[in-house]
Amino acid sequence: MAFCAPPAYLTHQQKVLRLYKRALRHLESWCIHRDKYRYFACLMRARFEEHKNEKDMMRATQLLREAEEEFWQNQHPQPYIFPDSPGGTSFERYECYKVPEWCLDYWHPSEKAMYPDYFSKREQWKKLRMESWDREVKQLQEETSPDGIMTEALPPARREGDLPPLWWHIVTRPRERPT
């Protein structure tokens, strides 16, 4: 499950990178021959590199807006979408066949013996989750005000020195920005 931040919360660099990737994908739809695509991709990269070190944020924002308008005018009417990507013909087609994690608890010991490394690690993770779950829930309750959650900001992932919760990607955010 991928998290997609709303455009208002993206940094300028993230917006530029996403525009560049979208532009390359649409260019790929326009240029079906690989050599022609590569030539125009290099030209596009040069256009982006030209303003890479722009210090004036007003100018950089204006350039980004102009580039997005140019992209909007020149985008492909029927861009190629990969089948497993959102909007593709096979997107989430096989979700119904994915087996939940708890089903592995009911495997026969002879089946588990075929994957000893995986199941030994899995047992360690389950034990760790059972030991840390109550502590993590207590921590979240302590950090939440009595009036309830006042903002949409997610609680921190852990206190210093604690192990990361196993469900952090669902309910928490990292305490510090990763480097």
From Swiss-Prot:
Modified residues (N-acetylalanine): 2
Main location as per UniProt: mitochondrion
Chain positions found as Phosphoserine: 85
Subcellular location: Mitochondrion inner membrane
Gene Ontology terms describing biological process: aerobic respiration; mitochondrial electron transport, NADH to ubiquinone; proton motive force-driven mitochondrial ATP synthesis
Entry's Gene Ontology cellular component terms: mitochondrial inner membrane; mitochondrion; respiratory chain complex I
Membrane-protein topology: Peripheral membrane protein
InterPro entries, alphabetized: Complex1_LYR_dom, Complex1_LYR_NDUFB9_LYRM3, NDUFB9
Keyword Transferase belongs to the record: no
Regions that span the bilayer: none
Coiled coil (UniProt feature): none
Pfam families: Complex1_LYR
Homology family: Belongs to the complex I LYR family.
Biological role stated in the UniProt entry: Accessory subunit of the mitochondrial membrane respiratory chain NADH dehydrogenase (Complex I), that is believed to be not involved in catalysis. Complex I functions in the transfer of electrons from NADH to the respiratory chain. The immediate electron acceptor for the enzyme is believed to be ubiquinone.
Record text on subunit structure and interactions: Mammalian complex I is composed of 45 different subunits.
Entries under PANTHER family matching the protein: NADH DEHYDROGENASE [UBIQUINONE] 1 BETA SUBCOMPLEX SUBUNIT 9, NADH-UBIQUINONE OXIDOREDUCTASE B22 SUBUNIT
Protein name: NADH dehydrogenase [ubiquinone] 1 beta subcomplex subunit 9
Organism expressing this protein natively: Mus musculus (Mouse)
Recorded name of the encoding gene: Ndufb9
